[in-house]
Amino acid sequence: MQGTSSNGHRLVLFDIDGTLLSAGRVARDAILRSLKTSYGWSYTPDHEDRGKFDFSGKTDPQIVRELVVEEVGAERFEAGLPRALEIYLEELERQLLPGTVVPKPGIETLLERLAADPRVTLALLTGNLERGARLKLEPPGFNRYFPFGAFGSDSADRYQLPPIAVERALAHSGKRFEGKSVVIVGDSVHDVACGRSLGVRSVAVATGITSPERLAAEGPDALFDSFADTDRAFDAIVE
């Protein structure tokens, strides 16, 4: 599919956890239950000490691999992964009770403004499995802003996801987005590094676990402590 030039339009790719919302420890607890059931793997403080619970910017399959592969081996990891992810999604759905999902400051107003702008195509760029992403976005009603995206269920490699999102944007809108017409919005160093490696723009926000100083060191095109100032955030995204 050839598509037309984006001509001043923007494809804005949003991360979920730490950027759009927080679901507390729900996803972590769901992962732990899943790994206990599917691999017999149990959490110990040593895993925390070795940094294995830094999930920021990673895909769900990558998270499972990093947690268990050293202890269960590559063959058992691969064999058990489909069931582990299935159990994770079941646990996630069970634990996402009312009040567990909290939108980040300013994000609802920002999404409304972006969605109303005819220059903007919104999509997701997330390490979440697609079903997991939709489960998290349902409580605040954010699914309506994101008709498509690229997910951890498309590839375990985060850096392979933006081209998938661009191709889906072409199918959805008929526009071919490239270079600086693509904007990655996220809260992790991986979001910024991903944007830089692909030659697209990145807008970082320090509403996740990564400090503003750490994000700034990666050289995003714009950096915010939060999106509470929606006018500034909007301008930075669509410039």
Regions found by a protein language model. Name each.
Residues V68-T109, D117-P118:
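Metal-dependent phosphoesterase signature
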Residues L161-V192:
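Conserved Lys-Pro-Asp/Glu-containing loop-to-beta segment of HAD-superfamily phosphomonoesterases
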Residues P61-E75, A165-R168:
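Helix-loop "lid/cap" segments that line or gate small-molecule binding pockets
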Residues E138-A169:
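Histidine/lysine/aspartate-rich catalytic loop segments that bind and position anionic ligands
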